[in-house]
């Protein structure tokens, strides 16, 4: 009996004009997620997804490449305007933001939503090199 050919499911094209870009930049990686106003994910990318391994993931260039990839996927869904929420202490924050602006998005607002403790958990010990 012949095996039935599996059908390739094509992702349906949503028509969303505005959304929110969540840029999470850690010391080791940069993750960018573009959502609609309700928080449903439209596209996402990270420096690790772009093929960067190890310490190269934490570079501004890797964050720029991830932002360009994420922006390209969001433009396919018809997105034009973005609010940007930046989180974390990493080095890829500004370069990811610049890459989103260069991709043709109109950035309406930039918010820093990095969580700041009011003397919460004890921080990790200082690194001595």
Curated annotation (Swiss-Prot):
Single GO MF descriptor: rRNA binding
Pfam families: Ribosomal_S11
Highest rank taxon of the organism: Bacteria
Gene Ontology cellular-component terms listed: ribonucleoprotein complex; ribosome
Complex formation: Part of the 30S ribosomal subunit. Interacts with proteins S7 and S18. Binds to IF-3.
GO BP terms, alphabetized: translation
Name of the molecule in the record: Small ribosomal subunit protein uS11
Record function comment: Located on the platform of the 30S subunit, it bridges several disparate RNA helices of the 16S rRNA. Forms part of the Shine-Dalgarno cleft in the 70S ribosome.
PANTHER family: 40S RIBOSOMAL PROTEIN S14/30S RIBOSOMAL PROTEIN S11 (PTHR11759)
């Amino acid at each position: 009996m012949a095996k039935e050919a599996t059908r390739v499911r094509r992702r349906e094209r949503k028509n969303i004009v505005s959304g929110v870009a969540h840029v999470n930049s850690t010391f080791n990686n940069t993750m960018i997620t573009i959502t609609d106003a309700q928080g449903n994910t439209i596209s996402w990318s990270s420096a690790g997804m772009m093929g960067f391994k190890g310490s190269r993931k934490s570079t501004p260039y890797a964050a720029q490449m991830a932002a360009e990839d994420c922006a390209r996927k969001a433009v396919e869904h018809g997105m034009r305007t973005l609010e940007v929420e930046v989180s974390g202490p990493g080095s890829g924050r500004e370069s990811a933001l610049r890459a989103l602006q260069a991709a043709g998005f109109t950035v309406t607002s930039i918010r820093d939503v990095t969580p700041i403790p009011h003397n919460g958990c004890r921080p990790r010990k200082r690194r001595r090199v």
